Amino acid sequence: MSWSFLTRLLEEIHNHSTFVGKIWLSVLIVFRIVLTAVGGESIYYDEQSKFVCNTEQPGCENVCYDAFAPLSHVRFWVFQIILVATPSVMYLGYAIHKIARMVEHSDVDRRFRSKSFSTRWKQHRGLEEAEDDHEEDPMMYPEIELESERENKEQQPPAKAKHDGRRRIREDGLMRIYVLQLLVRATFEVGFLIGQYLLYGFEVSPVFVCSRKPCPHKIDCFISRPTEKTIFLLIMYGVSCMCLLLNVWEMLHLGFGTIRDTLNNKRKELEDSGTYNYPFTWNTPSAPPGYNIAVKPDQMQYTELSNAKMAYKQNKANIAQEQQYGSNEENIPADLENLQREIKVAQERLDMAIQAYNNQNNPGSSSREKKSKAGSNKSSASSKSGDGKNSVWI
């Protein structure tokens, strides 16, 4: 296993823990991994070769060394580091798997919402029902999303989620597994402290008295650098105790922090209960930004002229709406061509309606002129027949 893999692994553990867990990780790296790899190699490299006994009995030194150190100090500490770090590694794997699933579900929900908002709306038939030409007049214009912007959004990788504290761990549903790995880690620390005391005690003696077979009698064996090894042994005791205290501190931090958050939430709920809350929320469906919809008024007398005028006004409103919301988009020329074509059709309809309206009004005016001429002739005739008589005006 290379150091780069171990470094990446510890970095991921650092990103998925509380600040107390980050302190524990720093102690693990500096005072355990580095100290064991550097100091242990230089101190214990000649441990067995420098173990000398005052006898020449074959096999006696090996038996006495086995009695002095059933397990080498360095191997014991390496085994301790592996077992203590195992719960954190297992928690890391679980956290990465769960966060990846959460990110995947959030991406699916986001895509579903974007598809629901980008659906193509059908043309409004409010004015079509009153017309007799059986032609559809579009009353809604969707805000078209650029393909380049959509591709850029799809190409952007999702942001990497990191846990920076206790609240984030609780929000993602990792609190139970995090507390469980703390308990297992603390149990391992206590077990290794007891085992280290039973195997080595608190001091490395310079002389070890051995009476095992095949030694003929009690012999004295001498250990190299006993004082240096004693100091190193005490340092490792201190590091183990420090890691155990950090585990206890982190569990207390999680417990008291959770209690404090619960009390704060209850206090906020009590404060919010005093304010008036509406019994329902207004969840009426609405069109996305950029859409314009015309509502058919009730009991409105539709004529050909009114239809043409309303279509002309609606097209002008659509132009203003598209200029307001779509000024920064690249697909404006295509939309303007469609709008200009529709405006041209609406203007032609308006001219035809005005012409038809004028033609309908001209026969009425001519009949009125004829009637007025007939009335004038009758009045002139009556005036001629009644010459010499006084007319009385009332």
Swiss-Prot record:
Q: Name one GO biological process term.
A: gap junction assembly
- Positions of region (Disordered): 354-394
Q: Which InterPro entries match?
A: Connexin (IPR000500), Connexin45 (IPR002265), Connexin_CCC (IPR019570), Connexin_CS (IPR017990), Connexin_N (IPR013092), Connexin_N_sf (IPR038359)
**What UniProt keywords apply to this chain's record, in alphabetical order?**
Cell junction, Cell membrane, Gap junction, Membrane, Transmembrane, Transmembrane helix
Biased region (Polar residues) positions are 356-366
Chain ranges on the Extracellular side, renumbered to this chain: 46-75, 200-229
Disulphide-bridged cysteine pairs: none
- Single GO term (MF): monoatomic ion channel activity
Topology relative to the membrane = Multi-pass membrane protein
What is known about the tissue distribution of this protein?
A: Mostly in heart and stomach.
> What family name appears in the similarity comment?
Belongs to the connexin family. Gamma-type subfamily.
From the Swiss-Prot or TrEMBL record, give the protein name.
Answer: Gap junction gamma-1 protein
Its gene name is GJC1
